[in-house]
């Protein structure tokens, strides 16, 4: 309650000075409208104030305007305008703008893909301490994208991101340990996956669950596997949703619950996991965890069959006879 009152007062002060023409206040008021600080979120109103701040020469406003135009958030999508504002902010040293411009070059978003140019801007942002850019620069050197592959040049950038507590960097370190050489270092991988998982990084949560499930790098623990599969599944990782469904279906690490299994098979099936589509079809076919519905069964068997899942072909032939 008190915090809400303070946020509202803060927003009112920003508005007062923004309306008096103070550019910093205009930018801050725009942020309030983006994040819903002391006011209901309103992307269009945010863009209005960011434009005012941008006109007064606030580089951070240029950066945010670039994001808004690229995403179409609060304004009609316009890639050319978005890139213009991002580049303007990047050239003025805004680290986030430098990173976003690098991403545009890396993925060819709104301009021709240019990995060399991407590395140039990643390096500028990384040099200012932005952990996202430090990680991407590590990956570029690690896999030779835009620069010659050089693990000795790569590693310090990963360490810089790790020292800042960046969850995705923890995951990258774990991944590197897991797949290092012929045998890897699974125990070290689990250590880093766990660090990233606890910070909420979904792919690390999934990989940690797999380690607990299969006893790789740690003692097998079905209950912990279920816990981390669920965490990753709730963040939309399709493979985790499929594995979580299997936990509920078989009572592995959690009490058997076929209705919950169907829920997660459905989530994974919607994301295109062929085996989840088959299993969902099976549940509809035999009324396992859900009311029997042969029409739905055929629908999901067919989706799995279209991806080459052989068992689905057999089940379809049986139902369509």
PLM regions with names:
Residues 17, 52-53, 88-89, 124-125, ...:
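Canonical positions in the second alpha-helix
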Residues 19-22, 35-37, 42, 55-59, ...:
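Short helix-capping/linker turns of helical repeat alpha-solenoids
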Residues 28-35, 63-71, 75, 100-107, ...:
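Hydrophobic face of amphipathic alpha-helices that form TPR/SEL1-like repeat modules
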Residues 2-6, 306-321:
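Terminal, low-structured helical/coil segments at or just beyond the last alpha-helical repeat
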